[in-house]
């Protein structure tokens, strides 16, 4: 099992190109199931989760060509409507094949999801929405089985804001008969990117980027060509890395407008951030100020940046509160940050972080995707060497992170389990 070895204390400088968004690429790949014509995608990140999704689609009979950030999908010969446990257990986003399969083929059998160990994240909103559209759904032997001759448009009000739920129901609705209205829809940019692809494929969707999506169902979708939006979480992670380690770094192929909640907090921390249409420059040469924040749905501060910003707060001057409102059990990185010398206590869904002047390198273990990124950020600032175990979590969501950091001057190397 690979590990990362990081020697702290080196400021970062140079340029980094931000990859395509994982959380846009995964639903967009699933959208390829909705048409018998080819869908050509660009700026697809090379991540473990993307490779897993392509493997799943391949098992279903989708013909795939991929390489150099490009993926072409041809779902004209899909012959297997099952997403098995072996695939779904490693990646929750596999649930996103449910809506497209039921909408186009009238049947789907999807294992109940796994993925990051950060709370329940139930799929009941997906199921309720599809049932409202006329699907017959049973759950037995660990599988969700859905059947429908043709889904019927309806009004769906989700009990909670759910990103994957919105995406699944949106993909189902584009081929349903009549009008579907999704109220309390997730507004995340990644949902918007999926919607834009669907429109390019011939779907009729109004309200993109709002919490009310109105979809007029069509009989079939055609092929399309689409470029995946930049990954705002990868961009935010690099911004926090520079803020912690110090330095002067320019991010390319980024969308500053969808990062405003993060950059606002970075400026509050004393970081200098400049931005243009598709670039950001971040500079830092001092200890950050402690910043209190609360996670919430877009456009508020993203839960997927909570761990990285907490790592920054560990070395800040002052005390901060971090309130996690989206997922329970999303403070698993706290114990590991404390091993590096951080001073963090937890009370329910709130973490109290008292900044320390210096962290010290140690052996730590990644527990989930964003937690692993927080340990990398802390290690860049720590005194001495840090060994991060279980970095397969990092590989699920970051495209060559150690390569990009090394190019910026960080001392990072990947070692196999036998070398560590």
UniProtKB/Swiss-Prot annotation:
Binding site for phosphoenolpyruvate: 22-23
EC numbers on record: 2.5.1.7
Residues the record lists as binding UDP-N-acetyl-alpha-D-glucosamine: 92, 121-125, 304, 326
Any single Gene Ontology cellular-component annotation: cytoplasm
Reaction catalysed by this enzyme: phosphoenolpyruvate + UDP-N-acetyl-alpha-D-glucosamine = UDP-N-acetyl-3-O-(1-carboxyvinyl)-alpha-D-glucosamine + phosphate
GO process terms (BP): cell division; cell wall organization; peptidoglycan biosynthetic process; regulation of cell shape; UDP-N-acetylgalactosamine biosynthetic process
Active site: 116 (proton donor)
Pathway annotation from the record: Cell wall biogenesis; peptidoglycan biosynthesis
One Pfam family hit: EPSP_synthase
Molecular function (Gene Ontology), one example: UDP-N-acetylglucosamine 1-carboxyvinyltransferase activity
Residues bearing the modification 2-(S-cysteinyl)pyruvic acid O-phosphothioketal: 116
The keyword RNA-binding belongs to this UniProt entry's keyword annotation: no
Protein family: Belongs to the EPSP synthase family. MurA subfamily.
PANTHER family recorded: UDP-N-ACETYLGLUCOSAMINE 1-CARBOXYVINYLTRANSFERASE
Name of the featured protein: UDP-N-acetylglucosamine 1-carboxyvinyltransferase
Protein species of origin: Paraburkholderia xenovorans (strain LB400)
Lineage: Bacteria, Pseudomonadati, Pseudomonadota, Betaproteobacteria, Burkholderiales
């Amino acid at each position: 099992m690979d590990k990362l070895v990081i020697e702290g204390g080196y400021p970062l400088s140079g340029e980094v190109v931000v990859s395509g968004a994982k959380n846009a690429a995964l639903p967009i790949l699933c959208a390829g199931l909705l048409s018998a014509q080819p869908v050509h995608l660009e700026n697809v990140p090379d991540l473990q989760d993307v490779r897993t999704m392509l493997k799943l689609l391949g098992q279903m009979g989708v013909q795939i060509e991929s390489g150099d950030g490009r993926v072409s999908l041809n779902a004209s010969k899909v012959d297997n409507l099952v997403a098995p446990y072996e695939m779904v257990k490693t990646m929750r986003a596999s649930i996103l094949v449910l809506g497209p399969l039921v909408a186009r083929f009238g049947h789907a059998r999807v294992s109940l999801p796994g993925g990051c160990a950060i709370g329940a994240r139930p799929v009941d909103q997906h199921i309720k929405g599809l049932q409202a559209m006329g699907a017959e759904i049973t759950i037995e032997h660990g599988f969700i089985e859905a059947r429908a001759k043709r889904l019927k448009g309806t009004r769906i009000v989700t009990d909670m804001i759910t990103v994957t739920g919105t995406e699944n129901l949106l993909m189902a609705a584009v081929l349903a008969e009549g009008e579907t209205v999704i109220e309390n829809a997730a507004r995340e940019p990644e949902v918007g990117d999926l919607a834009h692809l669907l429109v390019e494929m011939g779907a009729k969707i109004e309200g993109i980027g709002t919490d009310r999506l109105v979809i007029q169902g069509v009989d079939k979708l055609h092929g399309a060509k689409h470029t995946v939006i930049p990954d705002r979480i990868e961009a935010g992670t690099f911004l926090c890395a520079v803020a912690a380690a110090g330095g002067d770094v320019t991010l390319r192929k980024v969308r500053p407008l969808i990062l405003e909640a993060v950059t606002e907090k970075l400026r509050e921390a004393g970081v200098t951030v400049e931005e243009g249409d598709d670039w950001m420059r971040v500079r830092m040469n001092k200890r950050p100020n402690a910043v209190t924040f609360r996670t919430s749905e877009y456009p508020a501060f993203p839960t997927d940046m909570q761990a990285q910003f907490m790592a920054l707060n560990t070395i800040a001057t002052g005390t901060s509160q971090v309130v996690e409102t989206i997922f329970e059990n999303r403070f698993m990185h706290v114990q590991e940050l404390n091993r590096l010398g951080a001073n963090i206590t937890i009370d329910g869904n709130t973490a109290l972080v008292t900044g320390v002047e210096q962290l010290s390198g140690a052996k730590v273990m990644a527990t989930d995707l964003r937690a692993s990124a927080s340990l990398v950020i802390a290690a860049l600032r720590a005194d001495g060497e840090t060994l991060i175990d279980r970095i397969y979590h990092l590989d699920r969501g970051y495209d060559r992170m150690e390569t990009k950091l090394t190019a910026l001057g960080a001392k990072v190397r990947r070692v196999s389990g036998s070398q560590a």
